[in-house]
């Protein structure tokens, strides 16, 4: 039966990876005005003899990369990330996967505009920003950031870094250094991405100087992304030790990768020096509208698990350490780390340096921060060909405006029960935060009610508001009527006394008593216009106006009252005063 450990291992093999996000799934799959399109290209600097059976584009030098990507740049794409499939490290046996790289290009589309006005043209530039004898020096990162910032002040947009180590010993795979001129004589099939799924075109490169950006196109048979119909893009330096969008700044790791690949192909450099490492940086240079950018490093602790000298795991609380920077408008660009400081114990911590682009003043007016997705992807390879990776996920999220910012390779490599190799890669994506109204709408369970039910609920709320308003108005009207009736009742008592003194008939007394304290009516209490008019004149003027204006009833009692002499009227006045 077994203890079940093998079952757990098989489940891990099949699992594509963990996904973390600052949003829930319905919000992740909410479309915005912006969408993206990706192109992928895999390449290597290893020769066909050193890496047989690989469909990756073969480059003689890292300096060939701008020329290789020139056509995609002309179509509006620009380099977004560059990384090796496996992070090189000196603590385990090297693998050819350390020397296969992927370059990822991105193109932005604005749905609200018919033309791609936001796709400003770029030119890919490479620069050697540092040459160090001791790359593990603590001054490495500050100097590295300083060089990046100097270039950014000139309008360049930082993409990634490639450390390249030079050894005095030539690579075992090639007997002598390969110059750029000789490297172009190698048979290489080029595949230039076209159409929706970057198809490749076979071309024979010329023998021009590949050190210049627009020079030669180095090519290879078919993309490893054949099953997906897309051209994977990856990056690698002139020596296999190069690191891409995420890399380990380790001299031992870099030197280790030199065993087997071609030696330094850069014709402009002198004989390689022992222990020397050059750090190449990649920049996108805008053709127009250059703006100054600001970059800053963030140190994040990485938890490294080791099985002897082999790295078996690399984890971190990604969002816990990064969410605050995302909310403030920071855009992750690149990540580097060094495993040399890890203790020999089974578990240890090492610092990863993550480089963010600070939000500019003009963008801060429109961008209120970013949401993020972090994917711990297990990429499966059969030999040197990719079987499962993050490409389908990127393409599906591109429709919702998610932008790839960084891919961090790791030295974690496992062999599956089927003989395939899986390696862990950390993929970072960002998107501007959704408007608060959209977030609030998503947070309510409005999907439980149909449109008709929602309409009925709204109508009931409206009726409730109207009923309350009508009730309040009715209460106010009733109160006003009671006040008026009480005043009329007082006047009715007065008139009744006058009528009794003047010998008014019993018929007049009935209506007076019945209408006392009630609303005034034309046929009730106030029927004797003459008598009541004269009598009320001795009281308040307001009573006089009210009674005279409303009394339009029977006239006979009034005429009887007027038949009395003047003395009776005076007596009535005296009685009323009393």
Swiss-Prot record:
Transmembrane spans: none
Broad class of the protein's primary localization: membrane
Effect in UniProt of substituting residue 2 to A: Loss of association with membranes. Same effect
N-myristoyl glycine lipid sites: 2
Result of changing residue 3 to S: Partially affects association with membranes. Loss of association with membranes
Basic residues composition bias: residue spans: 457-466
Bias kind Basic and acidic residues: ranges: 185-206, 467-485, 506-518, 557-578
Originating gene: RFTN1
Keywords: Cell membrane, Cytoplasm, Endosome, Lipoprotein, Membrane, Myristate, Palmitate, Phosphoprotein
Species this protein is from: Homo sapiens (Human)
Quaternary structure annotation from Swiss-Prot or TrEMBL: Interacts with TLR4; the interaction occurs in response to lipopolysaccharide stimulation. Interacts with CLTC; the interaction occurs in response to pathogens. Interacts with AP2A1 and AP2B1.
Tissue-by-tissue expression: Expressed in B-cells (at protein level). Expressed in dendritic cells and macrophages.
Ranges of Polar residues composition bias in the record: 169-184
Role: Involved in protein trafficking via association with clathrin and AP2 complex. Upon bacterial lipopolysaccharide stimulation, mediates internalization of TLR4 to endosomes in dendritic cells and macrophages; and internalization of poly(I:C) to TLR3-positive endosomes in myeloid dendritic cells and epithelial cells; resulting in activation of TICAM1-mediated signaling and subsequent IFNB1 production. Involved in T-cell antigen receptor-mediated signaling by regulating tyrosine kinase LCK localization, T-cell dependent antibody production and cytokine secretion.
Family under the similarity heading: Belongs to the raftlin family.
Protein name as catalogued: Raftlin
GO molecular function, one term: double-stranded RNA binding
GO cellular component: cytoplasm; early endosome; endosome; extracellular exosome; membrane raft; plasma membrane; protein-containing complex
Topology of the protein relative to the lipid bilayer: Lipid-anchor
Matches recorded under Pfam families: Raftlin
Residues found modified as Phosphoserine: 183, 199, 220, 505
Lipidation (S-palmitoyl cysteine): 3
Disordered: region residues: 169-271, 449-525, 551-578
Compartments, as annotated in UniProt: Cell membrane; Cytoplasm; Membrane raft; Endosome
Any one GO BP annotation for this protein: dsRNA transport
